[in-house]
From Swiss-Prot:
<dbReference type="GO" id="GO:0005829">
    <property type="term" value="C:cytosol"/>
</dbReference>
<feature type="site" description="Transition state stabilizer">
    <location>
        <position position="243"/>
    </location>
</feature>
<protein>
    <recommendedName>
        <fullName>Acetate kinase AckA</fullName>
        <ecNumber>2.7.2.1</ecNumber>
    </recommendedName>
</protein>
<dbReference type="Pfam" id="PF00871">
    <property type="entry name" value="Acetate_kinase"/>
</dbReference>
<dbReference type="InterPro" id="IPR000890">
    <property type="entry name" value="Aliphatic_acid_kin_short-chain"/>
</dbReference>
<dbReference type="GO" id="GO:0006083">
    <property type="term" value="P:acetate metabolic process"/>
</dbReference>
<keyword id="KW-0067">ATP-binding</keyword>
<dbReference type="GO" id="GO:0047900">
    <property type="term" value="F:formate kinase activity"/>
</dbReference>
<feature type="binding site">
    <location>
        <position position="387"/>
    </location>
    <ligand>
        <name>Mg(2+)</name>
    </ligand>
</feature>
<keyword id="KW-0479">Metal-binding</keyword>
<feature type="site" description="Transition state stabilizer">
    <location>
        <position position="182"/>
    </location>
</feature>
<feature type="binding site">
    <location>
        <begin position="333"/>
        <end position="337"/>
    </location>
    <ligand>
        <name>ATP</name>
    </ligand>
</feature>
<comment type="pathway">
    <text>Metabolic intermediate biosynthesis; acetyl-CoA biosynthesis; acetyl-CoA from acetate: step 1/2.</text>
</comment>
<feature type="binding site">
    <location>
        <begin position="285"/>
        <end position="287"/>
    </location>
    <ligand>
        <name>ATP</name>
    </ligand>
</feature>
<dbReference type="InterPro" id="IPR023865">
    <property type="entry name" value="Aliphatic_acid_kinase_CS"/>
</dbReference>
<keyword id="KW-0963">Cytoplasm</keyword>
<dbReference type="GO" id="GO:0008980">
    <property type="term" value="F:propionate kinase activity"/>
</dbReference>
Length: 400
């Protein structure tokens, strides 16, 4: 066990993902999830030394109770883990324009996260609770907490990518612009793709597709992000599990004026009742859509719209590659496992030289990386993401 152990925290509004990772070699000593916060069935599950365990946190439990449990129950089983922690890394969904890289957390950073909360109202307030609880639970690491921003990697976008064609004052005075998300994942797979393609990162032109319950595509030119599909918030872009992605903005006025829906109802519909869930009217789970594609109309409908949108984004981002596209990369829960999504999407892009090898595509699932294109055609590659490792490495580097 090295002396570079980092506790990685990802606090959501109703859950907390946690892990202890060796920032040098990536070994994971503890991983877990506390979920169903504020509900009677609040629970925590974890894996340590290869064994999986689970416990109830008590009705209504939330971040504070979860961190208490991690410190006083889980880590009490293995005190040497606590003793060797050198830093705590926090995933922060939105850093606005202020943060272009990870930073050690102090009062000004806490204020910066608060200032960006209007762009991520479900996430940033939860991150702040996580930071406050971590400072309480690990007083010996009070100056070793690091914020790693999902938006940071996208801060290299040029103005023509991040500006909306709205009154310019909305950007200058209120920060209304494209920020993107999943930046830590897009950054990680960019580094890994450079190794697999045997190219220096700064010469790499790729399109990265992080596809999970949320999804985004990024255009990476010379190793830097030049455009991404998520916008001011994570609602723009691709079809997602429950999010609509791109729509005609006037649909909102139509729903309000014609159907009498309130702003809150429309917001809920676009974020929680749309996407794959809206199209199937059954589930947000891509596995259902893939498994039933050939037999159920709802699954086929959802898959076709999903892949159509994804292919359009990949195709449009080739225009930003300065005439050279080295590869398309798939990552995230769907990107890594849904072979059908990859095959159908790239099947629409034959004009760009993509041809999927069926066997290679099926082999690159369940944590396995690999090229999925036919020999001699444009590279397409699957790379399992590892956001926790990036967070651990940044936390370790900044607190060394």
């Amino acid at each position: 066990m090295s002396s570079k152990l980092v506790l990685v925290l990802n606090c959501g509004s109703s859950s907390l993902k946690f892990a202890i990772i060796d920032a040098v070699n990536g070994d994971e000593y503890l991983s877990g999830l506390a979920e169903c916060f504020h509900l009677p069935e609040a629970r925590i599950k974890w894996k340590m030394d290869g064994s999986k365990q689970e416990a109830a946190l008590g009705a209504g439990a939330a971040h504070s109770e979860a961190l208490n449990f991690i410190v006083n129950t889980i880590l009490a089983q293995k005190p040497e883990l606590s003793a060797q922690l050198t830093a705590i890394g926090h995933r922060i969904v939105h850093g606005g324009e202020k943060y272009t890289s990870s930073v050690v957390i102090d009062e000004s950073v806490i204020q910066g996260i608060k200032d960006s909360a209007s762009f991520a109202p479900l996430h940033n307030p939860a991150h702040l609770i996580g930071i406050a609880e971590a400072l309480k639970s690990f007083p010996q690491l009070k100056d070793k907490n690091v914020a790693v921003f999902d938006t940071a990697f996208h801060q290299t976008m040029p103005e023509e990518s991040y500006l909306y064609a709205l009154p310019y004052s909305l950007y200058k005075e209120h920060g209304v612009r494209r920020y993107g998300a999943h930046g830590t994942s897009h950054f990680y797979v960019t580094q890994e793709a450079a190794k697999m393609l045997n190219k220096p990162v700064e010469e790499l032109n790729i399109i990265t597709c992080h596809l999970g319950n949320g999804g985004s595509v990024s255009a990476i030119r010379n190793g830097k992000c030049v455009d991404t599909s998520m916008g001011l918030t994570p609602l723009e872009g691709l079809v997602m599990g429950t999010r609509s992605g791109d729509i005609d903005p006037a649909i909102i006025f139509h729903l309000h004026d014609t159907l009498g829906m309130s702003v809150d109802q429309i917001n809920k519909m676009l974020t929680k009742e749309s996407g794959l869930l809206g199209l199937t009217e059954v589930t947000s789970d891509c596995r259902y859509v893939e498994d039933n594609y050939a037999t159920k109309e709802d699954a086929k409908r959802a898959m076709d719209v999903y892949c159509h949108r994804l292919a359009k984004y990949i195709g449009s981002y080739t225009a930003l590659m300065d005439g050279r596209l080295d590869a398309v990369v798939f990552t995230g829960g769907i990107g890594e496992n849904a072979a059908m999504v990859r095959e159908l999407s790239l099947g629409k892009l034959g004009v760009l030289g993509f041809e999927v090898d069926h066997e290679r595509n099926l082999a690159a699932r369940f944590g396995k990386s690999g090229f999925i294109n036919k020999e001699g055609t444009r590279p397409a590659v699957v790379i399992p993401t590892n956001e926790e490792l990036v967070i651990a490495q940044d936390a370790s580097r900044l607190t060394a």
